[in-house]
Structures are given as structure tokens and as C-alpha cells.
Amino acid sequence: MFSISVTDDPSIGRRAATLVVVVVAVIFAAGLFDDLRGDEMARGFRGHVASASGGRLTGGLVKIAAGGLAGAIAAIPADGLGHKVEVFLLVALTANLFNLLDRAPGRALKVAFLFFFPLMVFGPAGVSVGMSGLVGALVALTPVDLREKAMLGDAGANPIGAVVGLALAYSLDEPFRLLALLVVGSLNVLSEKVSFSRVVDSTAWLKALDRIGRE
């Protein structure tokens, strides 16, 4: 499942930890900008594009631009145009996906841990090292988020998703990278029509998992 050629590439391994830090910083700044505005009326990709066509800058547009910038930076060490495009899209789209998941206490974190732990074990050494600090901080934050004493917000959920996308892009081989991109892209498109929270609440086993640890 995991590509030996990608995992063992020393140039990618050395740069990956730096990429994690840069990606988190860029996405965090955009997410914080959106959180601090707190007056957004536009919803979804189409809503933000419509606002832009009307000459109004929204926090969502800033996040879209930041996701593109972070994706472009993350793609720099990728080998070949195809891989660069996959890295770019996975980072940008996964950042947005986790923002969509952050609609209930602990939900985005639970999904993140499903990816982080296997990726830290099987992914490139640089990615594992780069993620370790973030994962440690998130483990400490989880009880606080579950008890609703604090919330991730865009400044938290978006960077988490971006790092998941980065790790997937540099840990999976070609067929699985494309599969991951297809799934993430499809979920982003689906979110324009379907409420993930409604799906979770109407599915017994998802609802049970969603409520684990919550008061």
C-alpha cells in the first residue's frame, strides 16, 4: 500500500518536516483570519466565488488562496508533474474537507487520528517527525475539544487537514494517491449538496462514534 520509493527518498524525507511547518503556518494564518472576521454570510465554494464576483473578499476566499499556496509549496519536492499536481490537490482539498468535518466536538480530531497514526508508522521519516509535534499537541487538545471548553475553528481544522493531505501525498504510491484524491475530491463536491452532520446523525454507528468522549 505504501510506496517504498517515496518513503525511502532521502531528499523528500529531509524536506518533509519543514514542509509540515510551512503548510501549517500558511493555513493557520488564513484560518485565523476567517475565525476573527466572524461575519461570513457566504457558504460553500460557490458562495465564496459569488461574493468575489461581487467584489467582496471573504474569509473563505482567503482560505482557498492559502490552500492553493500551501499546496504549491508542498508540491515543490515532488518528483514529476503528475505527483506535484496530486500533492497540490490533496493538501488544498483535504484542508477544506477537515474544515467541513469540524461541526461537532472532537469529530475532526477523531478522523485525523485515523490517518495520523498509521502514516507516522509507515510514512516518510521526515513526515513522521514533522507530524509528531502536531499529533502530540492534538492529543493534549482532544479532551478540551470533546468537553467543548475550546474549539478548533478554521485555524485548527484546516491545518490538520492540510497535514493529513501532505502525509497521504508523500506516503502512498501512485494508485493509492489517485484513489485518495478521488475520495477527498468527491467529498468536497458532495459537501455542496449534503450535510455531513445530517449523515452522521442519521447513521447509528457513525453517531455512536461521533459521541465517544463527549459529555
Language-model features, listed with the residues they occupy:
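"…together with the soluble PPM/PP2C metallo-phosphatase catalytic core" -> "…together
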Residues: 1-194, 198
